[in-house]
């Protein structure tokens, strides 16, 4: 199997790197970890905090949002590279185990999940996969969805010319999935795995998520641009859901 690289898009969290801590606990090779920040101030603070000594590359390119930060990661690796993009606030990845969830703590089990995801993406001739969005075992299953949007907490892709929309400060992950589905017909979601993460906490992108007006505009934009894939969610204002039947849930 080709080597896998890990890209962490980080913002204003030099002293609170949960995802990096998690990768280190599992024994992930630091040379395979890339961290991207989007301001010179962040770059200096992260260097002072010693982050540069914990990753293979600490890179910086000016950016205004998480889309720019993710695109910096994509531009840092050659086409065809397997890149697992991660938010910086992940405590652990969890696996459905019976009626509950169990944290993945070993490198071997973590890579087993990644290998399965990449194999399914290749089977369906698409560029990537993600995990179940909500940490609730009741709604999860051991199967997968062939065609679904996924959240960017863990977003594993093969690098192509596809990029995140730099005008989107939120739901940029959904928009990328829609572009991939338009081009390839699929984007895989593993329904038996989910991230335990500290979403919407200080640092990161909490400012963008607190802008409710922008969330509504983004949802309308996505539903208007990809009406064959997404529709507004009437039960959750400011959110979207898959339009029509969801694609191909499989074991």
Show the residue positions of the predicted features.
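Hydrophobic targeting segments
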Residues: 2-8, 23, 31-35
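Short, well-formed alpha-helical segments that are part of the catalytic scaffolds
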Residues: 8-28, 41-49
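A short acidic (Asp/Glu
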Residues: 17-20, 44-47, 94-97, 139-145, ...
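Conserved catalytic core of nucleotide-sugar-dependent glycosyltransferases
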Residues: 93-178
């Amino acid at each position: 199997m080709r080597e896998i690289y890990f890209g962490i898009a980080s913002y204003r969290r030099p002293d609170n790197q949960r995802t990096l801590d998690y990768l280190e606990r599992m024994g992930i090779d630091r040379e395979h970890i890339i961290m991207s920040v989007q301001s010179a101030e962040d770059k200096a603070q992260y260097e002072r905090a010693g982050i540069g000594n914990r990753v293979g590359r600490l890179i910086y390119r000016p950016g205004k949002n998480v889309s720019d930060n993710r695109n910096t990661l994509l531009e840092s690796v050659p086409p065809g590279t397997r890149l697992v993009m991660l938010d910086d606030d992940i405590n652990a990845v969890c696996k459905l185990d019976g009626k509950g969830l169990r944290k993945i703590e070993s490198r071997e089990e973590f890579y087993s999940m990644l290998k399965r995801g990449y194999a399914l993406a290749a089977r369906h001739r698409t560029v990537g996969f993600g995990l179940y969005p909500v940490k609730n075992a009741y709604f999860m299953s051991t199967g997968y969805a062939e065609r679904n949007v996924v959240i960017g907490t863990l977003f594993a892709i093969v690098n192509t010319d596809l990029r995140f929309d730099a005008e989107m400060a939120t739901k940029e992950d959904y928009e990328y999935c829609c572009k991939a589905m338009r081009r390839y017909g699929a984007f895989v979601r593993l329904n038996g795995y989910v991230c335990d993460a500290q979403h919407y906490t200080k640092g990161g992108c909490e400012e963008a998520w607190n802008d409710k007006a922008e969330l509504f505009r983004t949802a309308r934009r996505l539903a208007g641009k990809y009406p064959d894939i997404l529709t507004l969610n009437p039960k959750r204002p400011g959110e979207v859901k898959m339009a029509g039947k969801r694609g191909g849930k499989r074991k």
